Amino acid sequence: MPLVAAMLTRSNGAWKKATSVVQASICRDQQRPNHTTITSVTSVSQRRHFSSAENGAKPSRSHPSAAEAKQKRESDREFLISVLESSATKRDAKAYLQTYGSSKAKAVPKESPASTALVSDKAIPEAKDVSFFVQGSVPVESLEADEVPRVAIVKLREPQTWDDTLLGGVAKTLTRLRDLGLRSVIVLECSAEKSSVLDWKDVVTQQTDRLQKAIQKYGTPGAELVDGGIWKRSTTPPSASSLGHTKLSVGFGEAFTAPLRHGHILVVPSRAVVEETLEHTAADANEVIFALAKYFAGLQVNAGQNQTRTAVVDRVIIIDPFGGIPARNLGDGARVFINLEEQFNSIKATLSAAEPQDNGSPIPGISGNPKASHIENLELVKNILAILPSTASAVITSPIEAANLQSNQAYDIRRDAEEAMAGEVKTRRWQNPIIHNLLTDRPIYSASLPIGRIKSTTNGTYQRSSRMPTTTLAKKGLPVTIFPDTRTRSWQPPKPGTPRLKLTDTCVDLPRLIHLINDSFGRKLDAEHYLNRVQDSLAGIIIAGEYEGGAILTWERPFGLDEETAYNSGRLVPYLDKFAVLKKSQGAGGVADIVFNAMVRDCFPNGVCWRSRKDNPVNKWYFERSRGVRKLPGSNWAMFWTTPEAAVKDQVMEDYEDVCRGVVPSWADSKAAD
């Protein structure tokens, strides 16, 4: 595991130094929460937000109790385990270190083209001062003047309904994110029933104070309350984005950027200052979040303000008691991954058509309607990700998952209510979905992984989980183009003699398709031979984005059958001929999952087969997504299929095997076929 290797390959001196940091951190005093208001924002830019370790002050001589020290050690151990269990690959580790590591970690030596997918032997050891792999209360370094912080904008929905254990767990996770290089700007949405404005103000004040104190327990610098940084105008200002039709804007940017540069976690209540009267008023939390995203991205157009990026928004995190966006079938739990470019409209339509909750919230103590909340969250992440770089992503999860609480009797009622909404599935050993996503840029479960393949990693056998994941990862994503179009129906065997799709048709960019195949497989396709081979059997093609990934599928005939006989007898075999992803897109953005899902859900929902070399390292990925696999005796092929078990008969398997044995490869070299 690369993150483990990153620890073990350090020198002994560096290891001792990192360990001493952890030990010293136990003895640090807890600082009181800071508070920035509209009356003091003019001094924010002049204040220095240093911890005692940063400004040279000596740590306090007071020591924690034995119980506190034990709790601290257990907390550090839990987080270290969560990092080690993140299932990060070498590619993940390299990408993470280049984005969030120290300046030395980012200066990874250039590699030869042949090794671009792997971390070189020298890359990890050079990151000697990436001390976040040994987690204690890690000293957070202030950024240089020309650096901008990497941040997550976090929405906490209904925190007043969370008990202290739940809030503390979420606070710990957000503090760990900061230790790993991602600083949070937290917006509170307290939408409880209120009888007066005064009552609502009291709730907001109470919850911001609770959250600050919860964060403060996990080291310094702590949380900074920014109350007065969001302004509201009586008229909507001009916007750099058509999505930004809001009266809210960031009125004093230094109230946010100064404490962020010094490592603070920001707490922002959902209220704004009316410019004309300088009075506080309630504000929609989603509009506050969008205003912050626009400001950080340099898209806020206000007179007298520079249109420059003040922070890099890498994540939008929504922690909602209702959890992630539900799957089409409630029994399948939350959607693991959403490609917004392709799926937003259909998912919103599905949610809108769902039956409303007649009896209010299904979770005790939580107000609101799940259906409305899910649609609101879906629209929020779409609007924000539309103005952020394509590398940004959104995580929608529940407080229990964000806190990574293990099985606890105190949460049995709430957990049962969540499972009643999401359904019960087989799941693996629990991981923190937010930490996992930061380290890998992926959800815990692959988007193309069948529900039946989600299993425990502790023993190889299927297990029932005491609770199930309710987390959704959303990205701006890629458009998916499918020929022939599947919006009306899936692909069907063509009647002999009828026109069919050709790879030379004008709708297909053949040079880019060939480049995709050559780049993905690392070898040259014999294009002429391949075109001749598939011209009479092509079923269709799937293209992700600008030919970043794709699949070519065919209708193959078992040996000895002519086209007419195979069609009339229903024995044409749906076959995955080529599955390709550009090397630069492999392991990132879910391109492979997007293509695979389009194949099995839209094109061939009744099953498809393919072959792969027995020693192909991709076979594990294929195995997890298939419904069956068989090694073909006397050959170097393994055969996979996604056909439902009820449809797998002896004749079907014989035809599948015959096709997988008989397809002639079309490579220009003499190497063994892939």
UniProtKB/Swiss-Prot annotation:
Residues 1-50 form a transit peptide. It is an enzyme of class 2 (transferase). InterPro entries: Vertebrate-like_GNAT_dom (IPR006855). Residues 33-74 are annotated as: Disordered. Its EC number is 2.3.1.1. Its main location: mitochondrion. Keywords: Acyltransferase, Amino-acid biosynthesis, Mitochondrion, Transferase, Transit peptide. GO terms for molecular function: L-glutamate N-acetyltransferase activity. It catalyses: L-glutamate + acetyl-CoA = N-acetyl-L-glutamate + CoA + H(+). It comes from the Eukaryota. Coiled coil: none annotated. One of its GO terms (biological process) is L-arginine biosynthetic process. Pathway: Amino-acid biosynthesis; L-arginine biosynthesis; N(2)-acetyl-L-ornithine from L-glutamate: step 1/4. Residues 33-45 have a biased composition (Polar residues). One of its GO terms (cellular component) is mitochondrial matrix. It is found in: Mitochondrion. Pfam families: NAT. N-acetylglutamate synthase involved in arginine biosynthesis. Belongs to the acetyltransferase family. This is Amino-acid acetyltransferase, mitochondrial.
